[in-house]
A protein has these predicted regions:
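Nucleotide-sugar-dependent
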Residues: 271, 327-345, 350-369, 379-390
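Acidic anion/phosphate-binding donor-loop and adjacent secondary structure
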Residues: 72-76, 235-258
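Nucleotide-activated donor-binding/catalytic signature segment of Leloir-type glycosyltransferases, i.e.
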Residues: 299-301, 305-341
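A short, active-site helix/loop in glycosyltransferases that binds the activated sugar's phosphate group
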Residues: 192-234, 389
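Conserved donor-binding/catalytic core segment of Leloir-type glycosyltransferases
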Residues: 209, 253-271, 277
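N-terminal subdomain of nucleotide-sugar transferases
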Residues: 1-75, 207, 283, 288, ...
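A conserved catalytic-core segment of Leloir-type glycosyltransferases
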Residues: 47-119
Length: 453
């Protein structure tokens, strides 16, 4: 089919986002944080999503159940939780539904083997087709996260020729090593389909963007048709973050009697606080007094197994403090989010763990953008990502490379010495907001308010 070469005209955007308004997840926040700026620019959105999130009342927001059994079970659990909480009714109803769907899920997995959410593309496509044929849509915008949104967008593009723009959150093709460019056909059926979908996006989308230079680079290597005539125009956008808790400026830091190193967010074997605990061993040996003065705080997630093992092996039960998820404080009335912001601003140093997998070359943690709003020093332990390293250096962060034990130990020693002298690095106030992302997207797709039909 011929590519629609005309510039984007018209403000009626159909936004396909499987996890829209879904319990604070990064895949949801990435699009929901853009909405105020899109509205301000004159966009008139209609959103299609799964039933897993909270319905938005500012504009048409249609929520559809996925048609496949695995996705139905997933969506049903979240819907029941949103409606009735996770009490006895949740346990009984979701248990019964899971039991009834088990054989059908097994059949779906055996014959297809895709991610559970794939089937949400079907209702999104059917309802999107009706809107487009009714002349109620000027542009289709798929964003994810879940690739079912992109599949629905692809079908709508092929069937109607509507303008289609694509926001890819995480790389669709996961490489295994620096030498792996992603050309090899995966054995996993879901990975194989994602590889196919990436090729289709670069061929049929009008514009497509990724969130890192690395992701754009490797997608271009695999799809040299990108940015050529009658193919997709590809570019990079930094997603940024809204000021957490309404932060608009950094506060003066008050040193306490402890050096508080704070990590916020999820942990895993490839993103583990054991990296920090291992580096504390030589620090405590060289500066014995530091053992009583250094504390590592973990907020927002359970400890990973490597961290738990390191605590046990080193006897660090008093060194690492696991706070878990911060909920609303009934005494003060502060929300969990407000409490998190307070803890971030009170930290001496914020820990940013990047990971050790190859996909780190194409990924920047969303937490990085939140950290920038706090005005606190960041200690980034990164892996194969010059773009992230450059942004950290630009802001006078402490920087180490994953796997470099000596470099990590040296950075920790520098933090200790700086703290002891009350001279921790003073980061430059250079936050990256969501507004700049929306402005770049609108500029790249050449959308102007005066073009509204």
């Amino acid at each position: 089919m011929k590519k629609n070469k005309s510039l984007v005209k018209g403000a009626r955007w159909l936004i396909l986002s499987h996890g829209f308004n879904m319990d604070g997840r990064a895949a949801s926040q990435t699009i929901t944080d853009k909405i105020p700026y899109l509205l301000e620019a004159g966009i008139e959105p209609t959103v299609f999503s799964a039933i897993t999130g909270i319905k938005d009342l500012r504009f048409p927001h249609k929520q559809f159940l996925a048609w496949g059994p695995a996705a139905f079970r997933f969506d049903f659990r979240h819907w029941i939780s949103n409606q009735y909480g996770r009490g006895w009714f949740y346990k009984i109803s979701t248990g019964l539904v899971s039991l009834l769907l088990t054989p059908f899920i097994a059949i779906e997995k055996f014959f297809l083997g895709y991610s559970s959410q794939w089937s949400w593309a079907m209702p999104a496509f059917i309802h999107g087709l009706k809107l487009i044929r009714s002349k109620k849509v000027d542009l289709v915008f798929s964003t994810g996260g879940a690739w079912s949104a992109h599949l629905a967008g692809l079908w709508l593009k092929k069937y109607t020729g509507a303008q289609w723009i694509v926001e890819v959150h995480d790389p669709l093709v996961i490489r295994s090593s620096p030498n792996d460019q992603g050309f090899q056909k995966p054995k996993n059926r879901d990975a194989k389909f994602r590889q196919y979908l990436e090729k289709q996006i670069t061929q049929y989308a009008d514009q497509v963007w990724w969130f890192t230079d690395g992701a754009l680079h490797y997608a271009t290597v695999r799809n040299p048709n990108l940015n050529t005539p009658n193919n997709a125009h590809g570019f990079m956008v930094l997603p940024g973050a809204e000021p957490p808790g309404g932060l608009r400026s950094a506060e003066s830091h008050v040193y306490s009697e402890k050096l508080n190193l704070c990590h916020f967010g999820s942990l895993a074997k490839d993103r583990s606080l054991s990296t920090i605990l291992n580096a504390l061993v030589p620090l405590f040996s060289k500066y014995p007094e530091s053992r009583e003065l250094v504390r590592v705080h973990a907020y927002g997630a359970p400890l990973d197994s490597l961290t738990t093992e390191a605590i046990k092996n080193f006897g660090f039960s008093e060194v690492l403090v696991a706070h878990g998820r911060l909920e609303k404080d009934l005494e003060t009335g502060k929300s969990g989010r407000e409490r998190v912001v307070e803890k971030m601003q009170a930290a001496d140093v914020l820990i940013l763990l990047h990971g050790r997998d190859e996909w780190c070359a194409e990924y920047i943690p969303s937490k990085f953008y939140e950290y920038l709003w706090t005005g606190r020093p960041i200690w980034g332990i990164t892996h194969r990502n010059p773009q992230l390293d450059g942004m950290l250096r630009e802001r006078d962060a402490y920087l180490s490379q994953e796997g470099d034990s000596k470099g990590i130990s040296d950075a920790l020693e520098k933090i200790w010495l700086d703290w002891r002298e009350r001279k921790l690095a003073e980061p430059k106030w250079l936050p990256i907001g969501v507004d700049q992302a929306v402005h770049k997207i609108l500029a790249e797709i050449e959308w102007k308010p005066e073009d509204i039909n």
